[in-house]
Amino acid sequence: MTSDDIPGNRADRTATPAASASVSAPASASTSGAVIEAAGVRRRYAGGFEAVAGVSFSVARGELFALLGTNGAGKTSTVELLEGLAAPDAGTVRVLGHDPFRERTAVRPRIGVMLQEGGFPSDLTVTETVRMWAGCTSGARPTGEALELVGLGHRARVRVKQLSGGERRRLDLALALLGRPEVLFLDEPTTGLDAEGRRDTWELVRELRDGGTTVLLTTHYLEEAETLADRLAIMHRGRIVTAGTTAEVTAARPARIRFELPEGVPAARLPLGLRAAAEGHRIEIRTHRLQESLDELLTWARESDVRLLGLDARSASLEEAFLDIAQSASESEKVAA
């Protein structure tokens, strides 16, 4: 999404104030429960293309939920429905108990949106840009506070056109946080940031969540989702193919054990039950019983007096689960065709 996708000015999409000046959600937030809900949601475009095909999920108050997927999976189309930029063709969407499209005035003042690609007047300074948006935001944070939150205080007098790509992303985040949102939508929040900037942003997002802000994150950085998300969902071709905690999503995928055998020790000597795949002396074992398989391997190595070189054993990562899901879904579609 870009700033051009938004009906009206962008400042309408920031949130209303809280009493405090911290990064926490407003004290006036409603009672606990799901604050983002999608049920059987479908979205079609001209020509009949269905970008969102029956998506259902919910996000609890104070939860950080990551929506992941391959390019064209339907993430942006789904998030646009949640942000109230369009109405679903079928199904229901609720944010803070309201239809975000038909009840915009009840929703928009309470949410913040960090776009994937913001649009700023390039000749304004950073401070002038924040003040301009703050002028359209009820009870906005002080400009200096917003800039310090995202690490741009020292760049306050710099013109926007002189900012790096990463600094522009920080400015996007500052604008999204101006109104102390109850619900925060983050679309690729750390694109263009260096490693330090990414970690700083992660820490800020954690503070927001810990303060009660509900966060919906879309990102291509799987490490980011793995680090931040309380729960996540992976989309493919308009559908959610798996959802849960990172541990739940990866648990269904095999762990792996990798090592090298010394010269003169063939892979055929390995215990048959390990089902090892060999490429020269390099061995990979994929297993759903990591502890048992590792114990069996180490017992064999000790009894056979074989040294396992570069031994590495680990559970499936989110990246491996993501790639496995995408590949499996694509293969299923080919078979169905």
Placement of each model-derived feature along the sequence:
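Short, charged/small-residue-rich alpha-helical element at the C-terminal edge
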Residues: 255-329, 337
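ABC transporter nucleotide-binding domains
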Residues: 33-38, 43-236, 242
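N-terminal compositionally biased, intrinsically disordered segments and leader/signal-like regions
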Residues: 3, 15-17, 32, 71, ...
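ABC-family P-loop ATPase nucleotide-binding domain
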Residues: 1-43, 328-337
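A generic structural signal for secondary-structure junctions
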Residues: 112, 134, 138, 251-254, ...
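An acidic, carboxylate-rich microenvironment
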Residues: 90, 106, 128, 248, ...
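ABC transporter nucleotide-binding domain
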Residues: 201-288
